[in-house]
């Protein structure tokens, strides 16, 4: 039953199904065990070989999506000045230093990488709050132990 489900999803059902049935018929005569273990492994290996082909085009799509850093930093609604035509040469040839505002890190964080926490300003407050709670717990613990004696 599994071979039918997998053969329907595979692109070449005619070539894989006869091989699986031939091996299935050969193994019970020799071992007397269940014949489904070997064909399932071969189907899994065939699926593994097909999967690396799919991520390849996804990585090539990322490379042409580079934008000009000047356009990334421009947050106004105004159109760019007409005197800029000399600047839009390739962005790789510009000698601008890459800083936090050029958008390079922002593009990487959108692809699933771990980006900055949206509440970065809250982090020092959380640390200070944790220290305060630990201090109060320590004081109350010492006071509780001193009262028992």
Curated annotation (Swiss-Prot):
Residues 147-149 are extracellular. InterPro entries: Cend1. It is a single-pass type IV membrane protein. Residues 40-50 have a biased composition (Basic and acidic residues). It comes from the Eukaryota. PANTHER family: CELL CYCLE EXIT AND NEURONAL DIFFERENTIATION PROTEIN 1. The gene is Cend1. The chain crosses the membrane at residues 126-146. Homodimer. Interacts with AHI1. One of its GO terms (biological process) is negative regulation of cerebellar granule cell precursor proliferation. Residues 20-35, 80-97 have a biased composition (Low complexity). One of its GO terms (cellular component) is membrane. This is Cell cycle exit and neuronal differentiation protein 1. The keyword Disulfide bond does not apply. Residues 1-118 are annotated as: Disordered. The keyword Cytoplasm does not apply.
């Amino acid at each position: 039953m599994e071979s039918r489900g997998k053969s329907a999803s595979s692109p070449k059902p005619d070539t894989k199904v006869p091989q699986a049935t031939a091996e299935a018929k050969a193994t019970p005569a020799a071992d007397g065990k269940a014949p489904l273990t070997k064909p399932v492994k071969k189907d899994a290996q065939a699926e593994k070989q097909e999967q690396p082909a799919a991520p390849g085009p996804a990585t090539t799509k990322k490379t042409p999506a580079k934008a000009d850093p000047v356009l990334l930093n421009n947050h106004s609604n105004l159109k760019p000045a007409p005197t800029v035509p000399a600047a839009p040469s390739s962005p790789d040839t510009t000698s601008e230093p890459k800083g936090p505002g050029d958008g390079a890190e922002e593009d990487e964080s959108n692809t699933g990488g771990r980006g900055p926490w949206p509440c970065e300003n809250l982090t020092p407050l959380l640390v200070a709050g944790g220290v305060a709670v630990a201090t109060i717990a320590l004081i109350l613990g010492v006071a509780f132990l001193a009262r028992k004696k």
